[in-house]
Amino acid sequence: MGTALDIKIKRANKVYHAGEVLSGVVVISSKDSVQHQGVSLTMEGTVNLQLSAKSVGVFEAFYNSVKPIQIINSTIEMVKPGKFPSGKTEIPFEFPLHLKGNKVLYETYHGVFVNIQYTLRCDMKRSLLAKDLTKTCEFIVHSAPQKGKFTPSPVDFTITPETLQNVKERALLPKFLLRGHLNSTNCVITQPLTGELVVESSEAAIRSVELQLVRVETCGCAEGYARDATEIQNIQIADGDVCRGLSVPIYMVFPRLFTCPTLETTNFKVEFEVNIVVLLHPDHLITENFPLKLCRI
């Protein structure tokens, strides 16, 4: 089997907060004794910003300046050069998650154009004839709960052909009236988005009603900025011609890692929106957009 390197983090869910201590063990397993030139462990947190293809042409100068933003970087030497015995060797480690100056530990977030990631990397250096060994492991950071009281912000909405924007042929749209409400557009990330929708009337048959969660990522610097909206998830809340006057529940859970508390910094922004999408026969698409503010309490 050769020599295997592994990193085991103490917490099963791998979730940590600023100010806590990240601890665990590095495990070296081998059938025979292993000669090595030292073992080191690096903790790194970075924000990777990427521009969409449509922006690259416009922002060539800007493209080069979107380099990863380092949040945290720390390396410790775990073992000096020597020899590991055969079998399994466990080396404990501890990393305090403290930041110098006014840096902030942003929450882990996997987006399309903004990626916030925290990793542990263990390197075992070996002699020229044997290959160096490397093992990487991701851990998750949750931002501190927001200070102050959380206040919900309910929204009532009415959708008719007259309320729609960006409609070229308004006269060609069938008549319809949809009402509903969202219980709050200020959302706690660990709680679902809820509300209800009622189809009061519609001349055309309804094919489907969907909820679409959208991320809006903005990357920018002195030369300009690029703003891109992409879909995170799409949930169908009604299929077929919905009964008129029937209350259709709106319920959406925010997915882990793909959402984070709404974030705004000097270099990038991560915001979220929800679209209520109604498909009418034959192929009319009605969309109502609601900006959301996500937070952790």
Curated annotation (Swiss-Prot):
Classification via InterPro entries: Arrestin-like_C, Ig_E-set, Vps26-related
Disulfide bonds: none
Gene3D superfamilies, A to Z: 2.60.40.640
Keywords attached to this entry: Endosome
Example of a GO cellular component annotation carried by this entry: nucleus
Tissue: Ubiquitously expressed.
Principal location class: other
Keyword RNA-binding in record: no
Organism domain of life: Eukaryota
Protein localization: Endosome
Signal sequence coordinates: none
Subunit-level organization: Component of the commander complex that is essential for endosomal recycling of transmembrane cargos; the commander complex is composed of the CCC subcomplex and the retriever subcomplex. Component of the heterotrimeric retriever complex consisting of VPS26C, VPS29 and VPS35L; within the complex interacts with VPS35L. Interacts with SNX17 (via C-terminus); the interaction is direct and associates SNX17 with the retriever complex. Interacts with SNX31; the interaction is direct.
Function: Component of the commander complex that is essential for endosomal recycling of transmembrane cargos; the commander complex is composed of the CCC subcomplex and the retriever subcomplex. Component of the retriever complex, which is a heterotrimeric complex related to retromer cargo-selective complex (CSC) and essential for retromer-independent retrieval and recycling of numerous cargos such as integrin alpha-5/beta-1 (ITGA5:ITGB1). The recruitment of the retriever complex to the endosomal membrane involves CCC and WASH complexes.
Family label: Belongs to the VPS26 family.
Protein name per its UniProtKB record: Vacuolar protein sorting-associated protein 26C
Record organism: Homo sapiens
Source taxonomy: Eukaryota, Metazoa, Chordata, Craniata, Vertebrata
Gene giving rise to this polypeptide: VPS26C
